[in-house]
C-alpha cells in the first residue's frame, strides 16, 4: 500500500514485524532517557503517562527506573508481542504493580502477567499504592461507556 506509514527506532524491527513493505527512510535523532529529562527539567511528579513506543517499551521503562517507584504514575502501555511482555515483567514486578488488560468496554480485567491476545494490546499498569485511586476512578466511570 503506497500510503502505509510507520515509525521505528529500529528499522530491523520494522522490517521483521507486521509485513511492512513501505520505503524505509532513516534519520539521525537525539534520544534521552525519561530520568535525565525529568532531572534536567526539575519535574516533581507524573500522575499519568502513555507509553506507546513501537516495541521499545522495556527501554523506555529502563530509562525511567530512577523515578518509576518515586512518582508511581498510572501508565497506559501498549505491548505488541509476548517477547516485549516478557521483558516488561521484571521491570514491573507483580508484587508491586497491578496490570489491567484493556480488552474492550466492560471486558477489562486485572491480570497477573501481560497476556497478548492479538486483538487488544493496551494495558493499564499502576503501583499497588494507587489501588484506592483506581477503584475511585472505576466507580466514577462505572456507567460511562464511550461506545454507546
Give residue spans per PLM region.
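Phosphate/nucleotide-binding beta-alpha loop and adjacent structural elements of enzyme active sites
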Residues: 1-148
Amino acid at each position: 500500500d503506497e500510503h502505509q506509514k510507520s515509525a521505528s527506532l529500529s528499522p530491523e524491527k520494522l522490517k521483521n514485524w507486521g509485513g511492512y513493505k513501505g520505503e524505509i527512510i532513516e534519520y539521525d535523532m537525539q534520544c534521552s532517557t525519561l530520568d535525565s529529562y525529568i532531572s534536567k527539567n526539575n519535574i516533581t511528579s507524573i500522575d499519568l503517562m502513555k507509553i506507546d513506543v513501537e516495541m521499545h517499551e522495556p527501554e523506555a521503562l529502563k530509562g525511567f527506573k530512577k523515578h518509576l517507584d518515586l512518582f508511581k504514575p498510572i501508565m497506559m502501555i501498549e505491548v505488541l508481542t509476548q517477547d516485549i511482555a516478557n521483558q516488561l515483567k521484571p521491570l514491573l514486578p507483580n508484587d508491586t504493580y497491578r496490570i489491567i488488560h484493556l480488552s474492550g468496554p466492560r471486558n477489562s480485567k486485572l491480570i497477573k502477567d501481560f497476556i497478548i491476545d492479538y486483538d487488544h494490546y493496551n494495558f493499564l499498569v499502576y503501583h499497588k499504592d494507587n489501588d484506592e485511586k483506581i477503584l475511585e476512578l472505576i466507580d466514577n466511570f462505572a456507567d460511562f461507556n464511550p461506545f454507546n
